[in-house]
């Protein structure tokens, strides 16, 4: 959680770890967000997604620079929903910057989420924990 607490705090969010160790549980209080230009020490789709989603509601432009481009599923989804977002690559295999503008009016779309065993595992585990339950997971490889 520490990896997302830091940039969100830089944006003006009020987030603290209940036990002071940077781990959940967290205390999150409302705050006015402002855009930042964040350079991530590692390529992480999770950290990048968190910052870009917060950037939708921030005042001013928000960008995330990674040493190499991580998975871009959030950027593709936000662009499809109408967000003003772009990714700039320097060279193949080198740093990439994703930039989003605030105050977007997003438009819902019909989407299909690809099968992913790591996501399905939670539902499978839940089905195993509940006696006499049934679960059907399709198209997961």
Segments the model singles out, each with a brief description of its role:
Residues 1-141:
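Structural preference for solvent-exposed beta-strand-turn elements
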